[in-house]
């Protein structure tokens, strides 16, 4: 059996053990095109042979930029890695300036794009990147070479021996990829991950995912340029799981069709799913509506392992049969695991989705740790709501004196590319300093409390952890995004982006004329209603932590407008700059 020590070993292992008819599947113009394990390997080898003919050498960097997950990305990935070259995945939504920076910083020699939209962005800065020899597109794009030309160039197998020799020369500790973190401040940093980093993380994370080997389907929609989904793609290959790719804005339609057993999620997505479900429940009438909200209330009290007693479990069984089964059917009916990561998951969502048997398991990790550090697992008592589970095997988690979480293990990055100073700041005595604050309970479960860098002191000298407040405020259906402010000021306050759709619906029911978004955010009744939500959230916090004032913003906070990173994290500095007038109003700065 193929021993897995390098990333390109995964498909060969899958071929020996499972030889799937459907290893990868992508929908093109309403038709599913499936790729077997054998085809996957054959095409990856064709890419390797072609890249050699195009002059690609060991340690060259090949950039891949795709608007959505698709089969071609994975074929390219293996084709590049087999040569000892590195795959540099780039978020499609970043600005042209960042494209130029990453392509130059990595010295990318070729760039593969998914479609015309991405091609136009690359084309606009191509002359600023002297190392870039050519650009190829997966879709047919006018005046752009197509990746099918590369596949055709690789049809001649006479240089396959050269590919095999290069493959054999790749060591587990060699650099596999540069992943540029979507920094909340400053330029992106290139995280250097080795084959061993990602292989170990996939193999250790696999132990936490209850999945039927060789006979299950996954739905992949989180960006594969992010290390979280990328590592899981390797894990799925190891499990013999068929991977179906879906656009992120059509998850429910694809899930109904594919009927996946496993998928990944981020809290923001789960929040939106929950809000949609509640909105549908609100539209019900009579007994149906009563039953629906009875089930939701029951779900919000959920504790695993029958901790609520037999009477609760009996009611839960009934709720699952009458209500929650319909929720499951909306995502295909087979879903048993949803791994949630990238940001803090509200405990109420963990409760209600697990009551509904979605198997939402929260984990914790960073790009620099390939990414998984810890994850919950329903089996063997390994699940505790409000925590990110226990550390995976071979991983040591240490809490520093100031509460910072420090990690040692085979998944810790090699360092930041071309940046020994920043590397030295975070890698100290073999431990990676995460910048997150947390604690480990008596049973070994890790709990994250805040970002070290995001905590601030008020002018009264009191520490405030903004994420805790933000997560509580976002439980309100009136609030879509929020940023807690107050560093060196007399009190904490908040900049709030209301949930415009929900508020307009609420206003209609209450016969309130709210007008445009600009008018809505200054409407007395809207402000008064959101003030009630803020007051309710404040009840959970100490006097000095409470949000004492807020302002509503008229724009929807987005990645494109610069409010958020591609992983939906707040760019605090930019949000503050955008709404400096509102900030100054709150604190009465002239």
Protein language model features and the residues they cover:
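Conserved ATP-binding/catalytic segment of the ANL
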Residues: 391-458, 475
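Conserved AMP-binding/adenylate-forming core of the ANL superfamily
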Residues: 24-55, 60-71, 76-78, 95-100, ...
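Conserved AMP-binding A3 loop
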Residues: 34-38, 176-202
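Structural core segment of the AMP-binding/adenylate-forming
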Residues: 82-153, 529
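Conserved pre-ATP/AMP-binding loop-to-beta segment of ANL
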Residues: 20-22, 137, 155-180, 187, ...
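Conserved ANL (AMP-binding/adenylate-forming) active-site segment centered on the GW(Y/F)…HTG consensus within
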Residues: 314, 381, 385, 412-435, ...
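Conserved AMP-binding/adenylation subdomain of ANL enzymes
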Residues: 199-220, 224-324, 334
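Conserved C-terminal "lid"/linker of ANL adenylate-forming enzymes
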Residues: 456, 481-484, 531-590
């Amino acid at each position: 059996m193929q021993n897995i020590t390098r990333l390109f070993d995964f498909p060969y292992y899958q071929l020996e053990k499972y030889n799937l008819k459907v290893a990868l599947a992508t929908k093109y113009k309403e038709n599913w095109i499936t790729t077997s394990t054998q085809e996957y390997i054959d095409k990856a080898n064709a890419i390797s042979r072609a890249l050699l003919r195009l002059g690609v050498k060991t340690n060259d960097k090949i950039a891949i930029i795709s608007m959505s997950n698709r089969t071609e990305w994975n074929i390219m990935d293996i084709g590049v890695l087999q040569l000892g070259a590195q795959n540099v995945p780039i978020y499609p939504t970043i600005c042209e300036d960042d494209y130029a920076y990453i392509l130059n910083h990595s010295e990318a020699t070729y760039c593969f794009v998914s479609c015309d939209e991405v091609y136009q962005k690359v084309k606009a800065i191509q002359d600023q990147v002297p190392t870039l020899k050519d650009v190829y597109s997966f879709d047919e794009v006018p005046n752009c070479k197509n990746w099918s030309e590369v596949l055709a160039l690789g049809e001649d197998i006479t240089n396959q021996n050269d590919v095999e020799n290069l493959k054999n020369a790749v060591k587990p500790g060699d650099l596999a990829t540069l992943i540029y973190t979507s920094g909340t401040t400053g330029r992106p940093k290139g995280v250097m991950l080795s084959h061993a980093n990602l292989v170990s993380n996939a193999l250790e994370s696999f132990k936490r995912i209850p999945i039927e080997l060789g006979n299950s389907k996954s739905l992949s929609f989180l960006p594969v340029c992010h290390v979280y989904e990328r590592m899981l793609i390797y894990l799925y290959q190891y499990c013999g799981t068929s991977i179906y790719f879906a656009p992120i804005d059509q998850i429910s339609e694809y899930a109904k069709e594919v009927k996946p057993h496993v998928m990944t999620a981020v809290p923001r997505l789960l929040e939106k799913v929950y809000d949609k479900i509640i909105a549908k429940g609100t539209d019900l009438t009579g007994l149906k509506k009563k039953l629906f909200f009875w089930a939701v209330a029951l779900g919000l009290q959920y504790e695993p392992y029958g901790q609520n007693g037999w009477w609760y479990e009996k009611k839960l069984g009934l709720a699952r049969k009458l209500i929650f089964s319909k929720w499951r059917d909306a995502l295909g009916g087979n879903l048993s695991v949803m791994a949630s990561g990238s940001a803090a998951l509200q405990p109420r969502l963990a409760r209600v989705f697990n009551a509904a048997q979605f198997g939402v398991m929260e984990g914790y990790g960073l790009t620099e740790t390939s990414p998984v550090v810890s994850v919950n697992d329903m089996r063997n008592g390994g699940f505790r709501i409000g925590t990110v589970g226990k550390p995976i095997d071979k991983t040591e988690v240490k809490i520093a004196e100031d509460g910072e979480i420090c990690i040692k293990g085979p998944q810790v990055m090699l360092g930041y590319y071309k940046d020994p100073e920043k590397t030295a700041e975070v890698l100290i005595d073999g431990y990676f300093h995460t910048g997150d604050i947390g604690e480990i309970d008596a049973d070994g479960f890790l709990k994250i409390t805040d970002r070290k860098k995001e905590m601030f002191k008020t002018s009264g000298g009191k520490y405030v952890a903004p994420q805790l407040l933000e997560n509580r405020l976002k439980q309100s259906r009136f609030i879509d995004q929020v940023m807690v402010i107050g560093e060196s000021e007399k009190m904490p306050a908040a900049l709030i982006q209301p949930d415009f759709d929900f508020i307009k619906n609420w206003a209609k029911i209450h016969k309130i004329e709210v007008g445009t978004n600009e008018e809505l955010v200054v409407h007395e009744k809207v402000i008064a209603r959101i003030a009630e939500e803020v007051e309710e959230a404040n009840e959970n916090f100490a006097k000095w932590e409470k949000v004492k004032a807020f302002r509503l913003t008229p724009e929807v906070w987005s990645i494109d407008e610069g409010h958020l990173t591609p992983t939906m994290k707040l760019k605090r500095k930019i949000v503050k700059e955008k709404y400096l007038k509102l900030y100054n109003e709150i604190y009465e700065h002239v």
